[in-house]
């Protein structure tokens, strides 16, 4: 059966081949008929036909696959029929594809034609807009045109008719004709100006007469000056006797006129504070007045000088071209140039010691600097550990917290330094002085860090607000350093000075003795194993001073390091301890060492003594000696060792140990004289 069906299909194949031979001849005729057919057919119906044809194809393919999978011989005819149906559907899909391409081409052609029309309309619109803009410019020019007479400010029309004579105003003509009215108003303006010119000449003559009278009176006043000077000279002894130096004050005020604004504000506010609150504060002005006067030249003169200096520079460059290094050095010197005048403030203490502050103004950097000089009232003993206490470079460091005076407070200076190769102002501080922030405040200068300003104005109110507090801090700093100097001299000799007012803080008998007191560096302090907690808390900084102490009793040795803040005694010293006795005992492995540290670091207010509390450091060291006695005397004795105790108990303790940490009674109770726990 299958072979018969194949034989029957052969003539069909031949007919299809005949059709293919004539396909090329009939192609053009069908192309045009299909193009016309596109306009008649509905695209939606073609789309639906496409979907139905695809579904039929899918159905036929699945049926053919099922028949082939069965493999029966009777299904061959049915498969061939379904193949024929599939070919018909493929032809339908090809036709739909051709129709879709024809529609796409027509849509593109229509879109292109519409776009050309839109472009043509847009070009016409642009041309019209350009013409409109051109016309608007011409209209604006016409409207902005002003005649010369419009620049003249004429009197109002009402005033013109009320004040102008009839011969000029001509109301019968000008009231109806604006042009004639304007001409008449201009004539009246000319008449008024002629009258004012005559008055001006009369005023000039009167001015010349008055100037001559002024010159005569000036000559008379100048003739009185020598007589007044002689009277002032004669009154000098009286002024000195009455402590009323009016002549010196007058000269100071005359010199103050040549001070720059920040130094002038500092001079005025310090003088006012001295007169009102502190008679022991002396304010003077020093420096070259002639050089200061030369700086205050009119702008025109300065421009002429600049042009002359430029010409001189051109001549010098023709003769000799300096090297780049010399040019940079000259620029640095010019950048760091100080004003010829300076203000000196002398603080006197009750005991007679004086602190002299000299304030300078760096003109190009727009900042103030200060230099310090200390004159003690008594001769100080030489103490190695007190070498930096009265060092002028460290004396005023951190007067306010964080203000070490090593960097410029003006943010704009860094850009100036970059141009001339200055890395940091700290390299020139020894020559220029320290630019502390409180120094800027005393001069009325304030530099906001968020938005740098090129020109900063000196503020009197800012200076007045900082003056009293700063003067008190300066005097306190001087007294505290002098007191520490005396204490260090005693500590180096193993003696702890305790004043009479503070002797009640300690028992009458303290056996432990201070055997060593010396200064150490910041790096040495960081290397110690028992200072880690203080460093992590941020209580040790490079600006602080560091000291090492050793307290001994028998075989026990208590090592301690002290952090001394520049703001002593407002900021108390911080102690870290290490006991070498039967091993190394630190606060990390011995709770009693930790309690001893808290006794001097936490309860320091008990040891301040009478105000201002300059004896705090020595009282803390004396308490450490007392605490070491308690620690050793309350330690249990090993009964297996024969002989007397190394540290016999001499302190009265209500209770030797307390709590699971077995802490010792370190609190001294006066006047009972016993020790207890806190």
Curated annotation (Swiss-Prot):
Residues 1-35, 294-329 are annotated as: Disordered. GO terms for molecular function: mRNA binding. It is found in: Nucleus; Nucleus speckle; Cytoplasm. Residues 14-35 have a biased composition (Basic and acidic residues). A motif (Nuclear localization signal) lies at residues 7-10. GO terms for cellular component: cytoplasm; nuclear speck; THO complex part of transcription export complex. It comes from the Eukaryota. One of its GO terms (biological process) is cell differentiation. Residues 301-314 have a biased composition (Acidic residues). Its main location: nucleus. Keywords: Cytoplasm, Differentiation, mRNA processing, mRNA splicing, mRNA transport, Nucleus, RNA-binding, Transport. InterPro entries: THO_Thoc5 (IPR019163). Component of the THO subcomplex of the TREX complex which is thought to couple mRNA transcription, processing and nuclear export, and which specifically associates with spliced mRNA and not with unspliced pre-mRNA. Plays a key structural role in the oligomerization of the THO-ddx39b complex. Belongs to the THOC5 family. Component of the THO subcomplex, which is composed of thoc1, thoc2, thoc3, thoc5, thoc6 and thoc7. Component of the transcription/export (TREX) complex at least composed of alyref/thoc4, ddx39b, sarnp/cip29, chtop and the THO subcomplex. Interacts with thoc7. This is THO complex subunit 5 homolog A.
């Amino acid at each position: 059966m299958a072979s018969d069906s194949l034989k029957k299909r052969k003539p069909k194949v031949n007919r299809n081949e005949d059709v293919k031979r004539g396909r090329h001849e009939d192609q053009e005729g069908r192309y045009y008929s299909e193009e016309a057919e596109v306009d008649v057919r509905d695209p939606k119906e073609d789309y639906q036909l496409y979907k139905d044809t695809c579904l039929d194809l899918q159905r036929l393919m699945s049926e053919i696959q099922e028949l082939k999978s069965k493999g029966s011989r009777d299904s061959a005819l049915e498969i061939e029929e379904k193949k024929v149906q599939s070919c018909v559907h493929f032809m339908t899909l090809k036709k739909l594809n051709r129709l879709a391409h024809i529609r796409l081409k027509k849509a593109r052609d229509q879109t292109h034609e519409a776009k050309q029309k839109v472009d043509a309309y847009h070009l016409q619109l642009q041309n019209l807009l350009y013409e409109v803009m051109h016309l608007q410019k011409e209209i604006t020019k016409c409207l902005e045109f002003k005649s010369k007479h419009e620049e003249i400010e004429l009197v109002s029309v009402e005033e013109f008719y009320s004040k102008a004579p009839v011969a000029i105003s001509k109301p019968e003509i000008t009231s109806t004709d604006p042009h004639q009215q304007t001409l008449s108003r201009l004539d009246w303006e000319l008449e008024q100006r002629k009258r004012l010119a005559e008055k001006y000449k009369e005023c000039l003559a009167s001015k010349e007469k008055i100037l001559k009278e002024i010159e005569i009176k000036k000559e008379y006043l100048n003739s009185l000056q020598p007589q007044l000077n002689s009277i002032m000279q004669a009154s000098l002894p009286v002024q000195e006797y009455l402590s009323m130096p009016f002549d010196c004050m007058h000269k100071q005020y005359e010199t103050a006129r040549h001070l720059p604004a920040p130094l002038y504000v500092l001079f005025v506010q310090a003088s006012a504070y001295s007169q009102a609150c502190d008679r022991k504060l002396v304010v003077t002005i020093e420096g070259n007045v002639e050089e200061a006067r030369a700086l205050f030249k009119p702008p025109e003169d300065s421009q002429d000088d600049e042009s002359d200096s430029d010409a001189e520079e051109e001549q010098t460059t023709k003769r000799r071209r300096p090297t780049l290094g010399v040019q940079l050095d000259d620029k640095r010197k010019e950048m760091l140039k100080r004003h010829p005048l300076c203000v000196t403030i002398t603080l006197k203490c009750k005991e007679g010691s004086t602190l002299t502050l000299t304030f300078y103004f760096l003109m190009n950097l727009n900042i103030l600097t200060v230099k310090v000089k200390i004159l003690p009232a008594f001769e100080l003993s030489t103490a190695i550990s007190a070498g930096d206490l009265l060092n002028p470079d460290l004396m005023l460091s951190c007067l306010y917290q964080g203000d070490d005076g090593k960097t410029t407070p003006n943010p704009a200076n860094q850009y100036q330094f970059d141009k001339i190769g200055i890395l940091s102002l700290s390299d020139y501080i020894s020559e220029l002085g320290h630019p502390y922030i409180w120094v800027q405040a005393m001069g009325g200068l304030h530099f906001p860090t968020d938005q740098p300003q090129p020109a900063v104005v000196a503020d009197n109110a800012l200076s007045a607000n900082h003056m009293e507090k700063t003067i008190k801090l300066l005097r306190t700093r001087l007294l505290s350093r002098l007191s520490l100097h005396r204490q260090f001299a005693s500590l180096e000799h193993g003696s702890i000075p305790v004043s009479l007012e503070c002797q009640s803080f300690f028992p009458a008998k303290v056996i432990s003795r201070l055997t060593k007191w010396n200064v150490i560096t910041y790096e040495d302090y960081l290397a110690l194993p028992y200072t880690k907690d203080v460093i992590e808390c941020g209580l040790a900084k490079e600006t602080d001073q560091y000291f090492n102490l050793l307290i001994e009793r028998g075989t026990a040795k208590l090592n301690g390091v002290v952090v001394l803040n520049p703001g002593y005694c407002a900021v108390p010293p911080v102690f870290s301890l290490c006991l070498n006795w039967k091993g190394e005992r630190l606060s990390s492995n011995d709770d009693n060492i930790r309690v001893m540290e808290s006794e001097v670091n936490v309860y320091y207010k008990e040891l301040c003594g009478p105000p201002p509390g300059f004896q705090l450091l020595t009282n803390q060291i004396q308490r450490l000696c007392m605490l070491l006695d308690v620690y050793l005397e309350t330690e249990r004795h090993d009964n297996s060792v024969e002989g007397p105790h190394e540290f016999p108990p001499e302190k009265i303790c209500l209770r030797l140990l307390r709590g699971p940490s077995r802490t010792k009674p370190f609190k001294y109770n006066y006047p009972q004289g016993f020790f207890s726990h806190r």
